[in-house]
Amino acid sequence: MELVLCFVIITISGVIRESSALLLRSPTSNDVFGELVASAERAQPLATRLTKRISRLNFNDREDDFWEDHGDASWNNSYTLVNGRTTLGSENRRRPASHSLIERPYYRDGRLSPVLGVQERRGRSVHSYHEEPVSFFDQRAFDEYTFRRRSQLHRQRARAGLRSRIKQNVRRLWTSARGAVRGWGRRVRRKIGDLFVGHLMPQLRRLRFWDQGLPPVVPPLIGNEPGQASVALVAERMEARLREKTLTEKNPTEAQQAVGTYLINSAENTWFISIPGGRYILLKKRGFLGGGGFGLVYHVEHPTTGQPFALKIFVQRVMNNEVGDKISDLIEDEFGVMKYFPPEWTPARMYSELRFMVPLLKLRVLGKPEFQDARNHLRIFSVCALFPKAQGDLEEAAALLADMDRTNAYNMRMSSTIQMVKLLARFHAFGLVHGDVKLQNFLVDKSGLLLLSDFTQILRTNERRYPPVVTVLYMSPEIATCLITRLRNAIPYTAEIDSWMLGISLYRLWCGDFPFGITLDATALQVAGIVIRSSASSLDFASCHDIPEQFREMIVGFLRKTPGVRLSPQQALEQFSLLNWKGPSPASDTASESEPVSTEEAALLQKE
């Protein structure tokens, strides 16, 4: 029952609402709304919507009349003239004077238009008037509008097609250009990156006030040896002679001139970078120390601290534009010595404790290529080896003994002999063979201690090598036999080969010349023939200066032709007590007998 009652109420409300709407829409002869609706119905297919103008102000507060749209669903909308007191529909009302509800046909805002709308006007005064209805539609204006509209659409389509083609072409060109620019940009960025990383960044890093290119710290040599004060005196004379040579040397060799021109110049500081590690080091060349077949050694130091170093530069003589691999292998051998020692032995520790002169760092001259060809037959490498600086080698020191008094000369030879034997025995304890023992490879420190150097030819004990490599004047009988008989079998390298070379070195230190009548200008075949024909018993010590009898026997043991009976450095330390010499007096040892060393003394020598 309640549902039926609700339905009846809703139905009655709808009927009342529709009746009110019909009253508002009923046209009369004098009704402005009726004429408006009639005109709008005739022009409905071409008419535009009337703008809905609704004021949200309070009607009771308004003084002027305005029009309210009751809907915009179609042109059959109902309109009501509203004033401040009442709202009326379908009645004769007064409208503003001189303001037409309908715009004039044909023109709107200065342009011809077939469809005219309705605009609302407000005036200050109102009065009753009658206006004939005006048609919304004009055929001529409509035809002109249709033609203009079609032409406009055609032009718009043409312009749209042209714009589309232009956009496609521009997009295609832009894609091609962008790809080219990206490729070019990548190459440019790569070049700029290489330039920045390789050249600008090192310069910027060097500009840092805390980075002064300091070289590594060289630890002092550990230990003392008897008679090293006399050796230090000779080292001081060697340093003075080196300074004099640096000041008076006016005619450098061709290789030295090429190094000064293409690699490092003494007139300016040179930046180096360590390999590996990338540590920047600033050094200044001070003078030339010496050179060999593939290297030149220079005295360098840090310009601020003055710490001295020895810099070895590798130079290869190239003949007929042919480049061999020997120099490259030699460079690798120079820095490959550390692989033969346990990892706990660093270069600084080996220098300080073992007294082995190994390169502290592998350097490369900053801003220089890997190598440079100078004067068509010299190849200069930018890779260098940095060593602690010594005063010179033992051959230079032996040449200065003639100008010294007998006591200091004797003490210097005694101390040098003991240190040479100990150094080589210490090296053999690692199971290695030096392969190039000679006076030039024993360096003299300013403290009077000797150091063993040049480890480019080292091998493990009993390791074979063919062809053998040796300094000609220090050739052992095994290598001489291989050279004379032209054997093509690899020769096993043992400690006995080093013992022969040590015997040659000691004989030259004490006697000033080579044994068996070998001369400095002898060829390899001549030396090989002399070594094979000679025997240790034929050694002549008549020209030797105050050599002790024990050292004569020791040199004879080192120069035995048969390797099996040849004396080794470790055996010499155990057999000859004079190697444990303590006093610096030349008269303290003139005995001819040779006393064996006791067990306690041998243990002490091994510890030393």
Swiss-Prot record:
Cellular compartments annotated: Secreted; Cytoplasmic vesicle, Secretory vesicle, Rhoptry; Parasitophorous vacuole membrane
Descriptive protein name: Serine/threonine-protein kinase ROP17
Entry function: Protein kinase. Virulence factor. Promotes migration of Toxoplasma-infected macrophages through collagen matrix, facilitating parasite transport through tissues and systemic dissemination. Plays a role in the translocation of dense granule effectors, such as GRA16 and GRA24, across the parasitophorous vacuole membrane in Toxoplasma-infected host cells. Phosphorylates mouse IRGB6 (TGTP1/TGTP2), an immunity-related GTPase (IRG) that protects mice from infection by certain intracellular pathogens; the phosphorylation leads to the disassembly of IRGB6 polymers into monomers and dimers.
Keywords: ATP-binding, Cytoplasmic vesicle, Glycoprotein, Kinase, Membrane, Nucleotide-binding, Secreted, Serine/threonine-protein kinase, Signal, Transferase, Virulence
Catalytic activity of the protein: L-threonyl-[protein] + ATP = O-phospho-L-threonyl-[protein] + ADP + H(+); L-seryl-[protein] + ATP = O-phospho-L-seryl-[protein] + ADP + H(+)
Residue positions the entry lists as glycosylated: 76
Family: Belongs to the protein kinase superfamily. Ser/Thr protein kinase family.
Pfam families linked to this entry: Kinase-like
Amino acids binding ATP: 289-297, 312
Keyword presence, Transmembrane: no
Gene3D superfamilies from the UniProt entry: Phosphorylase Kinase, domain 1, Transferase(Phosphotransferase) domain 1
Assembly with partners or alone: Interacts with ROP5; interaction with ROP5 does not affect kinase activity. Interacts with human BCL2; the interaction probably promotes BCL2 phosphorylation and degradation.
Signal peptide: 1-21
Enzyme class: transferase
Phenotype of gene-disrupted mutants: Gene knockout results in reduced virulence in mice due to greater immunological control in the host. Significantly reduced virulence in double knockout with ROP18. Modest increase in the loading of host immunity-related GTPases (IRGs) following infection. Reduced migration of Toxoplasma-infected monocytes and macrophages through the collagen matrix. Reduced dissemination of parasites in mice.
Record SUPFAM superfamilies: Protein kinase-like (PK-like)
Catalytic activity, EC: 2.7.11.1
Designated gene of the protein: rop17
Active-site residue list: 436 (proton acceptor)
Note: Immunization with ROP17-based DNA vaccines triggers both humoral and cellular but Th1-dominated immune responses in mice; induces effective protection against acute infection with Toxoplasma gondii.
GO terms, molecular function: ATP binding; protein serine/threonine kinase activity
Boundaries of every Protein kinase domain copy: 283-579
